[in-house]
Amino acid sequence: LDAWGGPVGRHAAVGRQRFWTPLRLIMLFAVIFLAFGFFSKAGCLETTHPTDGSQPGLLWDGRQYYKACYADPLPLYSIEGLSKGAFPYKYSWTTETGEERFMEYPVLSGMFQYVTAQGAQAWQAVFPGGPIEVVKYFVLGAVLLAILWMVAVWATYRSAGRRPWDTLLMAASPLVIFQAFTNYDLLAIAFASVALLLWARRRPVWAGVVLGLGVAA
């Protein structure tokens, strides 16, 4: 931060701002970079509108590569049976080589996907217009993941002690733009961040419980 305004002088009034506290500024940066992350996936949310009466679907045609917008939730919504309301780990499918496959995610990540799918299908039933179901699934999941990331940033800030601005390196990381909504890693990151905070507050039992949930995510 010294590069922006130089070092703090002897007569500087530090900590006098009532609204724009360090935490709120860091959270603002977190929201901005999450928004960039969501819009980086917009190219893969474009939908076809066929004229032959068939159902609209995602218009990918290789754009997940040349627009760098690939996100696992979009293809896995149908591959893993979530679009059919199938329960994770009970549903299986057969690959082109004849191999039987099941959902490969840890338990909490699998349940996160299932709950998100149920929410998207309820959204589709109540409001059938607008985006197609898989897009609603992605949007709902992105909102939940964004909340989890905010929790992770908050926990890291609380753990930073006398160096709260170090958390800005996390909130404003370019990796957020490209990876926040590519998969479900933010679920485990949120649990790990809270576990570290609990450990720093000398609550080892709860830290172990939350860290265990992170491992299951």
Residue spans of the language-model regions?
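Transmembrane-helix signature of polytopic, membrane-embedded enzymes
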Residues: 154-173, 206
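Specific aromatic-rich, kink-prone transmembrane helix
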Residues: 155, 174-175, 188-206
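Short acidic/glycine- and proline-prone juxtamembrane loop motifs at membrane-interface regions
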Residues: 180-188
